[in-house]
């Protein structure tokens, strides 16, 4: 059975994508952002450095929440073994693929901590033509909602999905299911590789629990000021819903 969304403070609903190649740069960003960011996503680029779990420990020591975004996908027994080990670390969110019901059920059963598992639905860099190339000739929203319902039935705690699909997911799954939205663009589309993007206020109005933002903060002239501006927008959006 899916567990209720994490009891997040408003400032923990902004997750910064720590997309850097090594520990030194990761911790430099944590210092630069200070208390403007309380939640960090660490992914595949950092894993390749061999310093992934050192960074995870450092974040936990600084009282930051951690989102492990490694999109685990394997046979059920192997994926479950990974989740069992990962649940021993101070992790708030972790991603698995949302394509395999038996694997999702095994992962849900193996999670022995407060970590919430999020199923990856359709990457925000993909549109309908990309799905068609994979043999799925359907609109992304239909695939996302179908996978969200399958994840919920398997006992997974939520999904990671475009803010464009947050409303349909919330309508289909109800209030007790976590929705985390990447590809958020506070100032609108910026012409990068993200195709299905929305703004901060829209994501929360449609039911998102948290958002993931990387480049709009990282590439800002003043990253801490950019993060604080997003925090203010989140607070306003939450107050309005």
From Swiss-Prot:
Keyword Lyase: yes
InterPro entries linked: Aldolase_TIM, OMPdecase, OMPdecase_AS, OMPdecase_bac, OMPdeCOase_dom, RibuloseP-bd_barrel
Residue numbers binding substrate: 19, 41, 69-78, 124, 185, 194, 214-215
Entry keyword annotation includes Lyase: yes
Highest taxon above the source species: Bacteria
Gene Ontology MF terms: orotidine-5'-phosphate decarboxylase activity
EC number: 4.1.1.23
Reactions mediated catalytically: orotidine 5'-phosphate + H(+) = UMP + CO2
Pathway it works in: Pyrimidine metabolism; UMP biosynthesis via de novo pathway; UMP from orotate: step 2/2
GO BP, sorted A to Z: 'de novo' pyrimidine nucleobase biosynthetic process; 'de novo' UMP biosynthetic process
This protein's UniProt keywords: Decarboxylase, Lyase, Pyrimidine biosynthesis
Alphabetical list of SMART domains matching this protein: OMPdecase
EC category name: lyase
Transmembrane segments: none
Pfam families on file: OMPdecase
GO cellular component terms, A-Z: cytosol
Active-site residues from the entry: 71
Family as reported in the entry's similarity comment: Belongs to the OMP decarboxylase family. Type 1 subfamily.
Assembly description: Homodimer.
Role summary: Catalyzes the decarboxylation of orotidine 5'-monophosphate (OMP) to uridine 5'-monophosphate (UMP).
Name this polypeptide is given: Orotidine 5'-phosphate decarboxylase
Species the sequence originates in: Stenotrophomonas maltophilia (strain R551-3)
């Amino acid at each position: 059975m899916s567990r209720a969304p994490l009891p997040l403070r408003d400032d923990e609903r902004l997750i910064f994508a720590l997309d850097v190649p090594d520990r030194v740069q990761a911790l430099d960003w944590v210092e630069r952002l200070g208390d403007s960011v309380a939640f960090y996503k660490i992914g595949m680029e950092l894993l390749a450095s061999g310093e992934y779990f050192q960074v995870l420990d450092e974040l936990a020591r600084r009282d930051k929440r951690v989102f492990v975004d490694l999109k685990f996908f394997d046979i059920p027994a192997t994926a479950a073994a990974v989740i069992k080990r990962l649940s021993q670390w101070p992790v708030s969110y972790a991603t698995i693929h949302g394509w395999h019901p038996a694997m999702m059920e095994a992962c849900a059963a193996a999670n022995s901590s407060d970590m919430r598992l999020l199923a990856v639905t359709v990457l925000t860099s993909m549109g309908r033509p990309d799905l068609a190339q994979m043999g799925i000739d359907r609109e992304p929203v239909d695939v996302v909602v179908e996978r969200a319902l399958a994840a919920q039935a398997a006992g997974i705690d939520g999904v990671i999905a475009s803010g464009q699909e947050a409303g349909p997911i919330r309508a289909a799954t109800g209030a007790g299911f976590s929705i985390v939205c990447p590809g958020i663009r506070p100032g609108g589309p910026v012409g990068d590789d993200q195709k299905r993007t929305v703004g901060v206020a829209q994501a929360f109005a449609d039911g998102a629990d948290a958002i993931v933002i990387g480049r709009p903060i990282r590439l800002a002239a003043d990253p801490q000021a950019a993060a604080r501006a997003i925090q203010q927008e989140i607070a306003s959006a939450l107050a309005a819903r």
